[in-house]
Amino acid sequence: MTNPMRSQFDIAWALTSYHFEGLTTEECLWRPATVGLHVHRDPDGEWRADWPDREGYDIGPPSIAWITWHINFWWSMTLDQSFGPGTLTREAVTWPGSADAVRSSGHHLRLGRRPFRAAIGPRRR
């Protein structure tokens, strides 16, 4: 039997990779509605994500760019708080700017999850 947390991690990563694979930048930046969470380029050229003050359906649907940013944000914060100095802030996590960069940052985060993988244990057969 495999370690349940390890199996969940592997499944989550496989699903993420599957959905990121054919993603285009145009799809990421497409807005499904006039209101909703999205990313915006700041004066320094960095892509910043909207951050809602509250949750609710009236906020509108998020763009794919925002969803990919949020995945990156969640994993970055989790790794920093669990295995790093715990000093990372939301403002320091930016959207990478393209679908190719989303895939690259996801791969980088997966490699950065080695401490997480070590903590949940090796795959058992």
Where are these regions (language model features)?
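Short, helix-capping/interhelical loops that line the mouth of catalytic, cofactor-
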Residues: 1-5, 34-58, 62, 68-125
